[in-house]
């Protein structure tokens, strides 16, 4: 399971000209599901995302996690993160999870974060989305479990 996280000062997702998810300070999480992923990996990755210290403390060091910084999550499904790009000029998605598997783990990821008290907004699974963000830093990390 893969999460590309970006520290943002604001981010939003639009589907059919309607904003369906928006946050101010927090993390935009692009979430990719691979074939071998399961609930255990999902919980490990969600915990890591919420605990990852990417927000600055009073000394300007990245010492604070999402909760300590008072941030929110915007979680967007992104199957292209599971692409194999090693060979050729076209990505292969054979390692990506099935749509059913990905939807289930995506929904569980969001629910897990919410049960931990994190304000969590979402995109729309498998929709054509327009994602707008102001990357704060920029600070971007690729997390994989």
Swiss-Prot record:
Annotated GO MF terms: D-tyrosyl-tRNA(Tyr) deacylase activity; Gly-tRNA(Ala) deacylase activity; Ser(Gly)-tRNA(Ala) hydrolase activity; tRNA binding
Residues spanned by motif Gly-cisPro motif, important for rejection of L-amino acids: 137-138
Annotated GO CC locations: cytoplasm
Entry-linked PANTHER family: D-AMINOACYL-TRNA DEACYLASE 1, D-TYROSYL-TRNA TYR DEACYLASE
Protein source organism: Shewanella oneidensis (strain ATCC 700550 / JCM 31522 / CIP 106686 / LMG 19005 / NCIMB 14063 / MR-1)
Entries under InterPro entries matching the protein: Daa-tRNA_deacyls_DTD, DTD-like_sf
Protein keywords: Cytoplasm, Hydrolase, RNA-binding, tRNA-binding
One Pfam family from the record: Tyr_Deacylase
EC number: 3.1.1.96
Protein's name according to its UniProt entry: D-aminoacyl-tRNA deacylase
Gene Ontology biological process: D-amino acid catabolic process; tRNA metabolic process
Function as written in the Swiss-Prot or TrEMBL entry: An aminoacyl-tRNA editing enzyme that deacylates mischarged D-aminoacyl-tRNAs. Also deacylates mischarged glycyl-tRNA(Ala), protecting cells against glycine mischarging by AlaRS. Acts via tRNA-based rather than protein-based catalysis; rejects L-amino acids rather than detecting D-amino acids in the active site. By recycling D-aminoacyl-tRNA to D-amino acids and free tRNA molecules, this enzyme counteracts the toxicity associated with the formation of D-aminoacyl-tRNA entities in vivo and helps enforce protein L-homochirality.
Quaternary structure and partners: Homodimer.
Catalytic activity: glycyl-tRNA(Ala) + H2O = tRNA(Ala) + glycine + H(+); a D-aminoacyl-tRNA + H2O = a tRNA + a D-alpha-amino acid + H(+)
Entry-linked SUPFAM superfamilies: DTD-like (SSF69500)
Similarity remark: Belongs to the DTD family.
Domain of life from the UniProt record: Bacteria
Subcellular localization: Cytoplasm
Gene3D superfamilies: D-tyrosyl-tRNA(Tyr) deacylase (3.50.80.10)
Domain remark text: A Gly-cisPro motif from one monomer fits into the active site of the other monomer to allow specific chiral rejection of L-amino acids.
């Amino acid at each position: 399971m893969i999460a590309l996280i970006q520290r943002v000062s604001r981010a939003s997702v639009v589907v059919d000209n309607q904003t369906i998810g928006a946050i101010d300070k927090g993390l935009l999480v692009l979430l990719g599901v691979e074939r071998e992923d399961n609930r255990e990996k999902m919980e490990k990755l969600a915990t890591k995302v919420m605990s990852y210290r990417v927000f600055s403390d009073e000394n300007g060091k990245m010492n604070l996690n999402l909760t300590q910084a008072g941030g929110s999550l915007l979680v967007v499904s992104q199957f292209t993160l599971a692409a194999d790009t090693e060979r050729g000029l076209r990505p292969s998605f054979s390692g990506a999870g099935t749509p059913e598997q990905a939807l289930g783990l995506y929904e569980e990821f969001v629910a897990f974060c919410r049960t931990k008290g994190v304000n969590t907004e979402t995109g729309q699974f498998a929709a054509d989305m327009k994602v707008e963000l102001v990357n704060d830093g920029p600070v971007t990390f690729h997390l994989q479990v």
